[in-house]
């Protein structure tokens, strides 16, 4: 087997700190210049798509509900890696040149849009119907009631699950390495390929960087939730 032919894939008797120090910045730079921008862009576009999808699935127009329901079902029913490869090879099939990074943004945005739409839809439905009636009573239209009364309340409810979606997306971007996006994990793979005898150390280092990023984001999430809780009646 391939693994049996490799040099020792263990930590050995001592951790190669020189290699860890030399590889730390190249791996981290992949996170700074690719992983984080990829996550932010995908999340922003995904949230726009999620809001559109959530509202469309609550629409009274049946064909609209059906189209977006199929979209959500297709995304939730297929692996993210498969979706990534489909988008990556879809545009060249129509003679359209698209670099790996924008291909990854499109794929991750579509994925986030489907999953986040369910969160947003559930958050909107959790707002008491009396809030709708209150908006109508003071002369607001359906659209104004939605955007000025309902969505602000739904937003607070959706913060925890959407924050978890964002943190999960950070980790999911490692799949972009499969289409040659030079993100954090891809950098680790490249360095590991040149140091096969210490490849485990490189991957542990990459995992540590992912963990630190996600841990810091979790702290930010906790602060936001505590601030929002101040406005909730106990």
From Swiss-Prot:
Record has Acetylation as a keyword: no
Domain spans labelled ABC transmembrane type-1: 32-221
Family the entry assigns: Belongs to the binding-protein-dependent transport system permease family.
Membrane topology listed for this record: Multi-pass membrane protein
Reported function: Part of the ABC transporter complex TcyABC involved in L-cystine import. Probably responsible for the translocation of the substrate across the membrane.
TM region(s), chain numbering: 8-28, 36-56, 78-98, 100-120, 199-219
Alphabetized UniProt keyword annotations: Amino-acid transport, Cell membrane, Membrane, Transmembrane, Transmembrane helix, Transport
GO biological process: L-cystine transport
Gene Ontology MF: a single term: L-cystine transmembrane transporter activity
Protein source organism: Bacillus subtilis (strain 168)
InterPro entries linked: AA_ABC_transptr_permease_3TM, ArtM/GltK/GlnP/TcyL/YhdX-like, MetI-like, MetI-like_sf
Superkingdom of source: Bacteria
UniProt name for this protein: L-cystine transport system permease protein TcyB
Any Gene Ontology CC annotation: plasma membrane
Assembly, per entry: The complex is composed of two ATP-binding proteins (TcyC), two transmembrane proteins (TcyB) and a solute-binding protein (TcyA).
């Amino acid at each position: 087997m391939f693994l049996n032919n490799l040099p020792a894939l263990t930590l050995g008797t001592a951790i190669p700190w020189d290699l860890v120090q030399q590889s730390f910045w190249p791996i981290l730079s992949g996170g700074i210049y690719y992983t984080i921008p990829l996550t932010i862009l995908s999340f922003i576009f995904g949230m726009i798509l999620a809001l559109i999808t959530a509202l469309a699935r609550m629409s009274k127009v049946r064909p609209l509900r059906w189209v977006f329901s199929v979209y959500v079902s297709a995304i939730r029913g297929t692996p993210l890696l498969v979706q990534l490869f489909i988008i990556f090879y879809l545009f060249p099939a129509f003679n359209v040149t698209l670099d790996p990074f924008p291909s990854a943004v499109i794929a991750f945005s579509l994925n986030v849009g489907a999953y986040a739409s369910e969160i947003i839809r559930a958050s909107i439905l959790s707002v008491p119907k009396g809030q709708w009636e209150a908006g109508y009573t003071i002369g607001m239209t359906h659209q104004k009631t939605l955007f000025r009364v309902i969505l602000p309340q739904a937003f607070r409810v959706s913060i925890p699950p959407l924050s978890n979606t964002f943190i999960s997306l950070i980790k999911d971007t490692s799949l972009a390495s499969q289409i040659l996006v030079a993100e954090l994990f891809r950098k680790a793979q490249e360095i590991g390929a040149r140091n096969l005898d210490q490849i485990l150390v490189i991957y542990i280092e990459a995992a540590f960087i992912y963990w630190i990023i996600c841990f810091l984001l979790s702290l930010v999430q906790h602060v936001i939730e505590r601030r929002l809780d101040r406005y909730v009646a106990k």
